[in-house]
A protein has these predicted regions:
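An aromatic- and histidine-rich active-site surface loop
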Residues: 14, 77-81, 95-127, 162
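A short, charged, and often flexible helix/loop element on the N-terminal side
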Residues: 52-82, 132-135
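Nucleotide-sugar donor phosphate/pyrophosphate-binding loop at the beta->alpha transition
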Residues: 78, 116, 126-149, 185-187
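N-terminal subdomain of nucleotide-sugar transferases
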Residues: 1-44, 156, 176, 180
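Structural motif
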Residues: 94-95, 156
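N-terminal beta-loop-helix "entrance" segment that forms/cooperates
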Residues: 44-53
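Donor nucleotide-sugar binding/catalytic pocket of nucleotide-sugar-dependent glycosyltransferases
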Residues: 39, 54-57, 140, 144-189
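Membrane-proximal helix-turn-helix segments that form the acceptor-binding/catalytic region
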Residues: 23, 82-89, 104, 108-112, ...
Length: 189
């Protein structure tokens, strides 16, 4: 299977989502899937069989990208989406694995290229934005609407916990597969 994995974070870094992405890549590699990963310009190299990592251009003015919403991530996401568009226009993919906010990129790619996607959901972005930036509260319904669109159009939504799965049930996803975080007592490399 040819898979495009959108990883909107520095990869690899020894923290949360990049660790989860590394575990996913290890599993897909062992299964023999061919995976193209698009990620940010920062992060250390990790090599797996059948996996090709594509990085956005080196944005020297952007460094130390932290988890959560930020202008740095927003700029990097624009470059990530452009790179995804270029790759999808050159190569056929069977599936897109969209991590966090890249689900909106995957939704657009689905509409234009008919590629189904799975939504790797670590949090409710609508809730996260409103909690972090209270001035956005009046726009909560807009964020919820786009989250609903992303959930409804996903082939599968993979939230990290039952509480998150419960919070998206109202959006009527096609299929939900809760994939909880795992113990990381062993080395990933």
């Amino acid at each position: 299977m040819n898979i495009l994995l959108l990883a909107p974070e520095p990869f690899y870094e020894d923290r949360g989502t990049p660790i989860a992405v590394a575990l996913i890549l290890r599993g897909l590699s062992e299964r023999g899937d061919l995976v193209d990963v698009i990620t940010y310009h920062q992060g250390s190299e990790v090599k797996y069989e059948h996996i090709t990592v594509h990085r956005i251009c080196n944005l020297r003015f952007i460094c130390n990208i932290r988890p959560g919403f930020s202008w740095k991530k927003l700029v990097c996401d624009i470059f990530l989406f452009v790179k995804a568009l270029r790759l999808v226009s050159r190569k056929r993919f069977d599936l897109i694995h969209a991590v966090e906010e890249s689900v909106f990129m995957a939704l657009i790619l689905k509409w234009f290229y008919k590629i189904p996607y799975v939504y790797d959901m670590d949090s409710s972005m609508a809730q996260q934005l409103v909690e972090k930036y209270s001035f956005l509260r009046p726009f909560r319904f807009v964020f919820k609407y786009f989250e609903k669109l992303a959930v409804k159009n996903a082939l599968v939504v993979m939230p990290v916990c039952d509480a998150l799965a419960g919070s998206i049930a109202e959006h009527m996803p096609k299929k939900v597969a809760v994939v909880p975080d795992v113990s990381l007592l062993t080395d990933l490399n």
